[in-house]
Design a protein with these regions (language model features):
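C-terminal catalytic domain of Rieske-type non-heme iron oxygenases
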Residues: 1-118
Length: 118
């Protein structure tokens, strides 16, 4: 059974199994709430083609650390970083041809780019 939040009866998510809440605060802050605590990701542009992500963790309940969503957070963040670096390498390849956004796969990227242009 996955570790989930104990949600009060007067909350809109009462009765649901919620393992994590994710908030993105434009443009570069992500707050990831888990039953064990909070993971903070800060995206720090270092130049036109270089970005650093600073990860911070605040453990509120050590007994839940390592369980459920966010339980193996270091591994997941390493995998995410590898995927982003691989995509970047492919997009910088001479064979890559930029095209339209994929409506089924790139809604988040499209939304982010629209926010940047506003």
């Amino acid at each position: 059974d996955e570790e989930c939040f104990d949600i009060p009866s007067n909350h809109q998510d009462y009765g649901k199994k919620i393992a994590a809440y994710y908030w993105w605060i434009f443009p570069n802050l992500m707050l990831n709430f888990y039953p064990w605590g909070l993971s903070i990701n800060v995206v720090l542009p270092q130049g036109i083609s270089l970005t650093k992500i600073a990860y911070y963790g605040l453990i509120l309940d050590k007994s839940k650390l390592g369980l459920g969503a966010g339980g193996d957070l270091d591994t997941v963040e390493d995998e995410d970083q590898w995927i982003v670096e691989s995509c970047d390498k492919g997009m910088n390849s001479p064979l890559y041809q930029r095209g339209r956004y994929s409506p089924s796969m790139e809604q988040g990227v499209h939304h982010f780019h629209r926010l940047i242009t506003e």
